[in-house]
């Protein structure tokens, strides 16, 4: 069984895409973020033979997130953990326990991601235990694993910096 997890945040003014605030109002940022999330979910929904999940922060108890799960027939769960690394580890471990053998996780920051990148990640998991999608800014847009996640990879990670990719590869 395969699972695709998309990490999303509840679209609350002042809580999403905060680095855009000097340029856009909090309400405009929320609308932009909703568009990002809707676009990426719409693309992911085209994948066949993959169960799709929304990993929601801080909770899935949000009208927009409920609407997405209903419209696109997704399953959802609340992210668990103190930082992004713990949230990623917990999402993978919980879904491996449910019987999933191949899991790919993406964020909602890349609405223009070609869906072929996600398909390619699943293909690479047939021969590899772990895959990543590197960003040009030194971060990651995708993490995939087969059968287990190596939690040490995500511990003491300097999230939201240009060092994530380098530290992941070490």
Language-model features: locations:
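A short, N-terminal amphipathic alpha-helix
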Residues: 33-50
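Short phosphate-binding loop-to-helix
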Residues: 66-102, 161
